[in-house]
């Protein structure tokens, strides 16, 4: 009997690998002789680096980078076990959490540090880069990233524009002749779960700018600057990026990644499923177990349990979901591949207690799930 265990993390409690370990321990109490394959998952957001590194036997390497407002911080690159792939999170260098609430101003914040993370990955010799772009503090269209990688964003007088969303107001030309040549051989996959265009009422500035500290007046200015940026990209490369689905992700980072670096935007869970070759493992499995900290009606929108379930259902495999808690509206997940879902909190307890005892509670619950599964046979 082969059982594939492919959960996401339980946020603020257990990493995806720790959840997988707990599920395995619970099942082994009933089915000690089964073959267990553990694939810690993620959906492209927080924890993706850790999950992919854990699943492939890789390592996380520290990198000093430039934070959104120019100070230095410790970022990181996840080098996967094959040594040819790396995964980075934009938030590690350009994240909103790196800027104090009273200092958040997307006219000033820059994605320069994300470019430094990419350079660090190139120095490691990688040929394939997975980039998560959630949680950014920036609205510069990825201009800072391009500058860090050697691109020149110039004013009419030939001088470089300032870093940040405001600098784009003076952009006249884009010169990519100085880009790091190794980028030409780098495959870049971007975990992107939004379809917002670059500009307009559904664009980066209008939708996400206020979350990053933009006032209504700033939103107007930022949107105009990104429009100018897109025009310069079209002039330099002949590529239209304003209306590309996902171009507005991460303050316009999607536009730079696709338009200037030739990256591909894909749902985060799809990237992780492909990177870990989940389909190959579930093809001959008897049972697939997934999960995350909370299963509710939003789980069907790009979250790990549904991604895993849909993959498993391609092969007709039964899928069980394990969660910290289930909401009243979670029943919708049964229409998307999860055959049964179980909450691990077994009595009234405070949130801190639930987080602290998550591993034990998972094992207790899963042991009973395993017993039920054994009865069916």
Annotate each predicted stretch with a short phrase.
Residues 1-133, 137-377:
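N-terminal loops that bind phosphate or other acidic moieties
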